[in-house]
């Protein structure tokens, strides 16, 4: 096994209406994918930064995110964390591994020799964390249905690990609770055959006066446990702070 993405679940008391939490999240942590689902006995609230699989204009896109630092309290601190992230050999090697996995996933449902990395090792910043991000695009092979095209990238390597199946077996052994919504896919399918999905990250479930948030970190041979633990806390902060 090269990497396992282990997660932990945070639990808090539900102190306000779920829709009000979502409204606050839109202001405090705007993200590429914002969503609110109101079911009979629970709500899903999310602000995900990461594409799972997208099919648009006959292009398949995956956008792996791997490598995280907290945001700095000042511009100077922010720049320090950004530079520190981009020179961290462990984070860079992890990202490269997951970028290669993303290229392989997209390649399964793309025409031969059309896979391109259109963005590589860029920094994206959100309210509480910053990430290393790359973008992979391929020309969609139409012999694959939209559902098979989605499954080519599911589950994402950035929330499971590599190789995926063994990583998921270890996750099942070590995590105390089933992930349920966390790390799954949320999105839509259009009548024209296109679709867009994100990974259920920075996502909370509100039910029975409880508020659950789950966050993970990629564990490799040279991981430092305290840093990985702090990474999960930093990722959960945006949602937990929206309760206030």
Predicted regions and their residues:
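Extended alpha-helical targeting/anchoring segments
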Residues: 1-244
């Amino acid at each position: 096994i090269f990497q396992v993405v282990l997660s932990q679940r945070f639990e808090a008391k539900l102190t306000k209406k779920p829709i009000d939490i979502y409204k606050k999240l839109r202001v405090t942590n705007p993200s590429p994918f914002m969503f609110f689902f109101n079911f009979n006995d629970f709500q899903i609230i999310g602000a995900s930064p990461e594409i799972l699989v997208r099919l648009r204009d006959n292009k398949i896109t995956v956008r792996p995110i791997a490598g995280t630092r907290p945001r700095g309290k000042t511009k100077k601190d922010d720049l320090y964390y950004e530079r520190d992230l981009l020179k961290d050999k462990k984070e860079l090697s992890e990202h490269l591994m997951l970028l290669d996995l993303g290229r392989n996933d997209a390649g399964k449902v793309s025409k031969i020799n059309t896979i391109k990395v259109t963005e590589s090792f860029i920094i994206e910043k959100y309210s509480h964390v910053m990430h290393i991000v790359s973008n992979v695009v391929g020309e969609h092979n139409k012999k694959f249905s939209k559902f098979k095209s989605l499954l080519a990238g599911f589950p994402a390597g950035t929330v499971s690990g590599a190789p995926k199946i063994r990583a998921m077996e270890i996750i099942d052994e070590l995590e105390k609770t089933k992930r349920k919504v966390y790390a799954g896919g949320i999105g839509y399918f259009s009548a024209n055959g296109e679709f867009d999905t994100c990974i259920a990250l920075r996502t909370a479930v509100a039910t029975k006066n409880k508020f659950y948030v789950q966050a993970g970190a990629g564990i490799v041979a040279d991981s430092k446990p305290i840093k990985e633990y702090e990474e999960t806390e930093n990722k959960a902060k945006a949602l937990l702070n929206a309760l206030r």
